[in-house]
UniProtKB/Swiss-Prot annotation:
Protein name according to UniProt: Protein PsiE homolog
Cellular compartments per GO CC: plasma membrane
Biological-process GO terms, alphabetical: cellular response to phosphate starvation
Coiled coil feature spans: none
TM region(s), chain numbering: 15-35, 58-78, 83-103, 108-128
Top-level taxon of origin: Bacteria
Pfam families named among the record's database cross-references: PsiE (PF06146)
Keywords in alphabetical order: Cell inner membrane, Cell membrane, Membrane, Transmembrane, Transmembrane helix
Organism from which the protein derives: Klebsiella pneumoniae (strain 342)
Membrane topology, from the record: Multi-pass membrane protein
Gene giving rise to this polypeptide: psiE
Length: 136
C-alpha cells in the first residue's frame, strides 16, 4: 500500500474502532440494566410460593449468569486491548447450553446431544488454556 493512503486507512480504522467501542459501551449499559431487572425478578420468584417457582428460579439464575458473562466479556474486551478472548465465548456457550438443558429436558436424546456439546466446549476450553495456545 502506498504511503499516500496510509493516513486515510489509519483514520478509517480508528473511526471504526471508536464506533465499535461506543456500541459495546452502550450494550454494556443495557446489559447492566437488564441484570438489575433480572435481580428484581429473581427476588420476586424467590418469595413466590408456587410449586413451579423453583424451576423459574433456576432458569432465572442461569439467565443472570448469561448477563453477567456478557458484561464480563465486554469488560475484558476493554481491559485486553480491544479484543475478545476466545475462552469467554466458550464460557457463554457452556452456560447457554446448560440453560437449554434446564429449560428443555423432555427428550433424553436431546439432553445427551447437549451434554456432548458441553463436553466438546470443555475440551475446547482445556485446549485454549493449555500452554501451547495461551497468549495472556
Amino acid at each position: 500500500m502506498s504511503s499516500v493512503y496510509r493516513p486515510l486507512v489509519n483514520f478509517i480504522a480508528t473511526a471504526m474502532q471508536t464506533v465499535l467501542n461506543l456500541g459495546l459501551l452502550c450494550l454494556g449499559i443495557i446489559l447492566i440494566v437488564f441484570l438489575g431487572k433480572e435481580t428484581l425478578h429473581l427476588a420476586d420468584v424467590l418469595f413466590t410460593p408456587e410449586p413451579t417457582s423453583k424451576y423459574r428460579l433456576v432458569e432465572g439464575l442461569v439467565v443472570y449468569f448469561l448477563y453477567f458473562e456478557f458484561i464480563a466479556l465486554i469488560v475484558k474486551y476493554f481491559q485486553s486491548g480491544f479484543h475478545f478472548p476466545l475462552r469467554y465465548f466458550v464460557y457463554i456457550g457452556i452456560t447457554a447450553i446448560v440453560r437449554l438443558i434446564i429449560i428443555d429436558h423432555e427428550s433424553p436424546m436431546a439432553v445427551l446431544i447437549y451434554s456432548a456439546a458441553i463436553l466438546i466446549l470443555v475440551i475446547t476450553l482445556w485446549l485454549c488454556n493449555s500452554n501451547r495456545l495461551k497468549r495472556e
